[in-house]
Amino acid sequence: VAADDLAPIGAFESDPVAVAERLLGVPHSLGARSSAATDCSGLVQQALYACGLAGPRYADQQAELGQAVDRSDARRGDLIVWLSPPGDHSWTGHSAFMLDADRVIHATGHHGAVVIEAFAEADARYRADGFHAPVFRRLQA
């Protein structure tokens, strides 16, 4: 490895979405969180860690991060979490990052990989599956 390709110890990324973008196409695998395979909350957790930010493992825990924002104010880097339907204890929800005002980046079983998708399409699919309306969380000022 060339020295120019190494970051100093303790150096962190500044944009979790840029970290997630480098993982586009990585296969989705429930419970995974690596560059070889990841699930939705694992992608969020990896991206936050790369930026020096604490990130819990599960979507319902991630829904408590940062400050609540309205959908109309959502922007790049905001976290979105669709919480699981009542009584469904097989998973805790689905998490994603806003890529911009209209698109998300997430690891999804529907597409089988980390993908960029229109927010409206993802939202319609998760709501049709019984998930709650998503919460939007601003992680950084």
Task: Outline where the language-model segments fall.
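Active-site nucleophilic cysteine motif
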Residues: 20, 34-51
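Second-shell loop/turn segments in exported
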Residues: 27-34
